[in-house]
Amino acid sequence: MICNMQFISENNFAALVGTSNATAQKWAESGTYPSHTENGVRGFYLEELEAIPEVHAMLNSKWNEECNPVPLRAFTSVELFAGGGGLALGMSLAGFHHVLLNEFDKAACDTLRLNRPQWNVLEGDIRNVDFTPLCNRIDFLSGGFPCQAFSYAGKQGGFNDTRGTLFFELARAVSEIKPKVFMCENVKGLLSHDNGRTFDTIKNTIAELGYTLVEPCVLKAIMYQVPQKRERLIMIAIRNDLATKVRFVWPSPFSRVMTLRDAFYKSEIFDTDVPVSEGVKYPSKKEKVLSLVPQGGDWRNLPEEIA
């Protein structure tokens, strides 16, 4: 029965396949893909779109088989640019023991210490951290070096931007620690920044460190049980002495798209509804900018002088 099919709104479908909301709307109106309406919202049934690679992957997912790996032993890790701990939490849930987390921002460090008092949080500038005591003691190093220098939503200064040079601090940490594997994430704009020369520099640096880079991949959060339209470039590198002995496989996507309702109310993500909260008030300047974004829009809808 058609009512048992998975419904996805036009906007979420656009995020899933990496196109604009306007394009998804045109597909629905032109009949490029069969559209339907549920509760006043127009969208599509995933089962009718299985020819699309992203949809096929979701409908034939091995998510449940891959979600509960059993570690062969206790694995150690180091987290750089830890922020509030999102990536670190994921690594912890995957079975890694954090030996060290480094973060510059005091508020973020306070958050880490409050939520995970057992973690060894080193607050301060990564440029002042000596990683040599951890040499050959760490299995995995990870970090999302600051992305403003490469972001589509930023001025794209790249390595000319002070923040862009922090990649080389991550590279120094890898050189001093010599982890078996390291991972870094950034915005997908990094791939095309400066006509690809920035990313070529990163790839060459990884090779000089003695690591083999797995073919980088842009992962969409919306495909991995996260109710968020966020895309991130994931880079994983394996130390050369191990690279021929292991095979890395990107994870299968979740079987359906999660929405804001899943984030706010009891669902497959959370056991309870989100508690009642006053929320956070934006500064007046930021609130004014956000008011210029139409429903379903993003930074690309802002006037050029603001975006």
Mark where each language-model region is.
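Core alpha/beta nucleotide-donor-binding catalytic domains of modification enzymes
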Residues: V55-K178, K188-S192, R197-D200, A207
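Conserved S-adenosyl-L-methionine
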Residues: E123-G124, K188, Y211-M223
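Acidic pyrophosphate-coordinating catalytic loop
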Residues: F131, Y224-Q228
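A short, glycine/Asx- and small/polar-enriched loop/turn
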Residues: R137, P227-R232
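A cross-domain feature marking catalytic cores of carbohydrate-active enzymes
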Residues: F145, N186, C217, S252
